[in-house]
Design a protein with these regions (language model features):
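Blade/loop signatures of beta-propeller domains
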Residues: 15-39, 177-189, 360-367
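A short helix->beta-strand "capping" segment at the edge of beta-propeller domains
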Residues: 29-49, 369-380
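Conserved beta-propeller blade repeats
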Residues: 47-65, 89-106, 130-148, 203-224, ...
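Short loop/turn segments that connect beta-strands within beta-propeller blades
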Residues: 77-81, 117-121, 192-196, 239-243, ...
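Asp-box/WD-like beta-propeller blade repeats and closely related beta-sheet repeat scaffolds
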Residues: 89-187, 196, 200-203
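Blade-level signature of beta-propeller repeat domains, shared across WD40, Kelch, NHL, RCC1
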Residues: 387-424
Length: 424
């Protein structure tokens, strides 16, 4: 499971305390400040939707998975919001397959990878993991998995605040600094599920993390150099044969920061949070792997979010807000679930007619500037942002899924993209 470390210290303002537990919280309501309907889609307390870039939907787009209070996995019907348990016992979920309706996960008792069919409940053990190794990515045709492992020393433990693995720690930034400075030998490895063959893809002393296979190309893996975003060349892609190891976002200024990258649904683009420099100018950047074109959508600081996401057709984006935007001017104005409409036209003219030069060499790609037009959907004023909401669009674009402890316990919620029509 990809680590959800953000790269920014929580300064000036602290996250709100988790509110008191509300027994039988409302099933649905209309946010009085936005006019958008919110639905609590999980019944059991301390259930969570997945990390923002982990596929949680079945290939037909009709169901999604979530984690249960005891660490298992349940599946939710997106038409009725009814759910059923599919995997019991404490497991570590990875993703739902892109080709078959199977959920992939790891059982810690035997450190092995399993897959369970969400329709039939048929379960198969796929591979034993090497000592110290974890799996965090499954490729597009479900024939290969990728993971990381540290080969020397003891990596800094990921501290959490006690309620569940979705919560981040107050000392997260310090942990990241320590881990980056340790320069531990680590590697990305793959396992071919057809043959069981294990192979080392990369081995070095950079902090390798955040693995994501392309959703369409089974031979293409994205990974990152983890650490404070302004200290690392973060986003990379590599082929499963070890070739074409490529830096996606070369830094061009001091304190430039990029991270929380994710694939477009068609596998043609990589999107990510970009700040030039950190805490001053904010973008959601897109890089087209086929054409090498770059598009930077400017975003207001008051709408910056910990995570961004996009619909399958990339016509809409969303963000989960933040308790403290990065930079020296922290405030609480970002505590919203946001909807963003991307625009590359200003004053009636395409922005691409005034493209900026990116890089220094002849023939370098030019950046297509754009802008996000934001709309507030859910006020998250009672949410403790140590639990990151991790927004995800449903495949039909009608809802944004997120997790929250606004009622004390954690549940998964859905907010309707269209404004609700209030009843009498």
């Amino acid at each position: 499971l990809a680590l959800a470390f953000a790269a920014f210290p929580r300064a000036v303002l602290s996250a709100p305390e988790t509110p008191p537990v509300v027994q039988n919280p409302p099933r649905t309501w209309i946010d009085p400040e936005t006019g958008h309907r919110v639905v609590r889609i999980t019944d059991e307390a301390n259930t969570e939707s997945l990390y923002f870039n982990d596929n949680c939907f079945t290939p037909d787009g009709k169901e999604m998975i979530f984690t249960t209070a005891d660490g298992g996995i349940s599946v939710l019907d997106l038409a009725t919001w009814k759910n059923r348990a599919v995997v019991k016992g404490k497991v570590r979920v990875i993703i739902v397959g892109h080709r078959t309706p199977r959920v992939f996960y790891i059982r810690s008792e035997d450190n092995a990878l399993y897959a369970t069919n969400l329709d039939t409940a048929e379960t198969q053990k796929l591979a034993n993991l090497p000592a110290g190794g974890g799996i965090s990515a499954i490729n597009a045709d479900e024939t290969m998995v990728a993971g990381t492992r540290v080969l020397e020393g003891n990596p800094a433990r990921r501290f959490v605040t006690g309620k569940g693995n979705g919560y981040q720690a107050d000392d997260k930034m310090e942990m990241m600094e320590r881990r980056l400075a340790a320069h531990l030998l680590n590697e990305i490895y793959t396992i071919d599920l057809r043959t069981g063959q294990e192979a080392t893809l990369i081995r070095n002393r950079d902090w390798l993390n955040h693995l994501q296979f392309s959703p369409t190309d089974p031979t293409l893996l994205m990974y990152c150099h983890e650490g404070p975003w302004w200290k690392v060349d973060r986003i990379w892609t590599i082929r499963t044969d070890g070739t074409q190891n490529t830096l996606v976002q070369p830094r061009t200024m001091e304190m430039e920061a990029s991270g929380h990258e994710f694939w477009s649904a068609d596998g043609k683009k990589i999107y990510y949070d970009l700040q030039t420099p950190w805490g001053v100018v904010f973008w959601v950047a897109g890089y087209n792997l086929e054409t090498k074109e770059r598009t930077w959508y400017h975003i207001e600081r008051s709408e910056w979010s910990i995570h961004f996401n996009a619909t399958n057709d990339e016509t809409l984006f969303c963000g989960d807000g933040a308790d403290n935007p990065p930079g020296p001017w922290a405030d609480a104005s970002n505590r919203w679930i946001y909807l963003f409409v991307p625009d590359t036209v200003i004053n009636g003219a395409p922005w691409k007619t005034v493209r900026w030069n990116f890089g220094t060499g002849a023939g370098e790609a030019l950046v297509h500037p754009g802008v996000f037009h934001g709309e507030k959907l859910v006020h998250m004023v009672k949410h403790n942002y140590l639990l990151e909401p991790n927004p995800i669009f449903t495949p039909d674009k009608k809802y944004i899924i997120f997790r929250s402890d606004m009622f004390g316990d954690t549940y998964a919620f859905a907010v309707e993209v269209a404004k609700a029509v209030p009843g009498p």
